[in-house]
Design a protein with these regions (language model features):
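Membrane-proximal C-terminal cap and juxtamembrane stalk of leucine-rich repeat ectodomains
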Residues: 3, 9-22, 28-34, 247-353
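Leucine-rich repeat
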Residues: 29, 43, 49-52, 64, 72-76, 87-88, 96-101, 112, ...
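LRR N-terminal entry segment and analogous cap-like coil->beta motifs
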Residues: 30-79, 83-86
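Conserved hydrophobic beta-strand positions in leucine-rich repeat
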Residues: 35, 54-58, 77-82, 101-106, ...
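Consensus "Asn ladder" position of solenoid repeat domains
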Residues: 40, 61, 85, 106-109, ...
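Recurring C-terminal helix/loop segment of individual leucine-rich repeat
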Residues: 44-48, 68-72, 92-96, 116-120, ...
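Eukaryotic tandem repeat interaction scaffolds
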Residues: 140-230
Length: 353
């Protein structure tokens, strides 16, 4: 009976102890192992925080810098939300104590570059969100140590360059979002090692050039979004190099140059059973001027007619020229034969006289 009487007191004391470790401006809930410090005016990381906290929300504050080993007292964190702050710098090893961290959200901040030590100690991370920052270059060292990452969102930055092997250690990555950046070309080696990638979003860039073998390593790709870029032409083998069971490709809102070559490419792609051009009916022509605004599917059967007619005209012209040459040669041959015959006759007459 005494134990039953003492137990509530112990629980109450434990709760008070937990709350005592909760910083001002935060709401700490022991049962859920979470601390909510969102939507405040925090300029520095709050302290203290319960050491058993697994979910920490610091979003929508005024944080500008994440120092070295910033979360040393909350090593058990699994989810860390730092989105919608003013963060412009992250020290090397800032997240290194968080060996159980699964989700890190740094979206909508002011981060311009990822240092060599940015990912130190984050081998357990499964989801990294860096959308709407100010990144311009992804270096080969940017994402080291992220061997178990499944989802990476880099959309709506200002990325113009992705170095070869920037994603080199991400053999488990399944979703990569690079949409809304400033990429102009995709070179071979950019997606090396992404054998598990299922979704690749590249929409809303300035891509006008794609190397033929750039998608070859993506042996699990199910969705490729290239809509809203600057593609005028595409090589058939660029997509043929995708050897997945089924890949859906989005290509609308590109300034296509509609000609016989383009028609042939899409006709061939349409015959490949594992490739699905989901928005083919929405593709429109930007060039030549007389086809501007027309849907490709409305004119695709006519694009090669002019070329065919031209080829026929050239062929007929060549045939006529050859026949005419043969006829002329034959006439000349006969003319020479008659002339020779007349000359021989004249010679015989002169001898007789």
């Amino acid at each position: 009976m005494r134990l039953l009487w003492v137990l509530p007191l112990l629980v109450e004391a434990h709760n008070k102890s937990f709350l005592h470790h909760c910083a001002i401006g935060c709401d700490c809930q022991e049962e859920l192992k979470q601390a909510n410090c969102a939507r405040g005016i925090l300029r520095h990381l709050p302290s203290p925080l319960p050491p058993l906290t697994e979910h920490l929300d610091l979003s929508q504050n005024q944080l500008s810098h994440i120092p070295w080993r910033a979360f040393q007292t909350t090593r058990r964190l699994k989810t860390l939300l730092l989105n919608d702050n003013n963060i412009s710098s992250v020290a090397d090893g800032a997240f290194s104590p968080l060996e159980s961290l699964l989700r890190l959200d740094l979206s909508r901040n002011r981060i311009t570059a990822l240092s060599t030590g940015f990912t130190l100690g984050m081998g357990s991370l499964r989801e990294l969100l860096l959308a709407e920052n100010r990144l311009t270059t992804l270096f080969s060292h940017s994402f080291q140590h992220l061997d178990g990452l499944l989802r990476l969102n880099l959309s709506h930055n200002a990325i113009v360059l992705v170095q070869v092997r920037a994603f080199g250690c991400m053999s488990t990555l399944r979703q990569l979002d690079l949409g809304g950046n400033r990429l102009q070309a995709l070179g071979s080696g950019v997606f090396t090692m992404l054998k598990s990638l299922e979704v690749l979003r590249l929409q809303g860039n300035n891509i006008s050039q794609i190397d033929i073998g750039v998608f070859t390593p993506l042996t699990s790709l199910a969705l490729l979004n290239l809509a809203c870029n600057q593609l005028r032409r595409i090589h058939y083998k660029t997509f043929l190099s995708l050897h997945t069971y089924s890949t859906h490709i989005l290509l609308e809102d590109n300034p296509w140059h509609c000609d016989c070559d383009l028609q042939r490419v899409f006709r061939k792609l349409g015959s490949v059973r594992r490739l699905f051009l989901d928005d083919y009916s929405n593709l429109s022509c930007a060039e030549p001027p007389e086809l501007h605004g027309y849907r490709l599917m409305e004119v695709d059967t006519e694009l090669c007619i002019a070329e065919t007619v031209t080829v026929l005209i050239i062929t007929v012209t060549v045939v006529i020229t050859v026949v005419a040459a043969i006829v002329m040669a034959e006439r000349k041959r006969k003319s020479r034969k008659k002339e020779k015959h007349w000359t021989d006759g004249a010679s015989e007459m002169s001898y007789d006289s």
